[in-house]
Amino acid sequence: MLTIKDLFVKVESDNGEDREILKGVSLEVNKGEVHAIMGPNGSGKSTLANVIAGKDGYEITGGEITYEGKDLFEMNPEERAREGVFLAFQYPVEIPGVSNATFLKAAVNEIRKHKGMPEMDAVEFLKFIKEKMKMLGMDQGMMNRAVNAGFSGGEKKRNEIFQLAVLEPQLAVLDETDSGLDIDALKIVAGGVNNFRSKDNAVVVVTHYQRLLNFIVPDFVHVLVDGRIVKSGGKELALELEDKGYEWVKNNEQFVMTNE
């Protein structure tokens, strides 16, 4: 589904100089899989998520990303979304004056139009939305509120997962969705992601801590350090990181040299 080959990315730093963030990242994600990207702060995790989604501000200096056999760099963010790429932001954006209902109905019908399907009318959409809200234990009053405006941190993250459930993308990229959540909110968010998982889609979970992976169990774990994937493994790798810390891989020359 998603193939990243030898990806190099740089950004312009505050002093105007270019800074290389990703330094030859390669990754293969197939349908039905959940991949966790872990790493210390500043390792390039969010950069990778943002580049997949097509966020502005990054310069691709090498490599390629293909999604369902198509060149992702040839698509703008809106085209990627219509093709089924979804990004749950680390810091969800507020859209004052636009209700969740209006936003999601427009998004759903845009995707349906892209697939050659008829638009949902108001009655169909309301029934569809109520089913999703019930599944996630969401208050129906959320639909009348402006997108993320005045929401608490936990409400914003739950709203992102609600959008995931409604839009039903093929590839979901979750950028530190667990950031700032208490254990109850974390369980709700993880439950929404687990309900989404199927043999027909894939999930990339970007996280700093192992605790999210207690609830969303990954098939593969990749450790990103200084813009490089220095180690990959199964779910047990996350537990090993929790026990030994990131210094374990940062200071182990064998890991770094193997991936240079």
Which sequence ranges carry the predicted segments?
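ABC ATPase NBD Q-loop/coupling interface
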Residues: 64-80, 148
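Walker B catalytic motif
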Residues: 173-177, 184
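The feature captures the beta-strand-to-loop junction immediately N-terminal to the Walker
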Residues: 38-40
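Helical segment within the ABC ATPase nucleotide-binding domain
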Residues: 186-199
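ABC-family P-loop ATPase nucleotide-binding domains
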Residues: 93-170
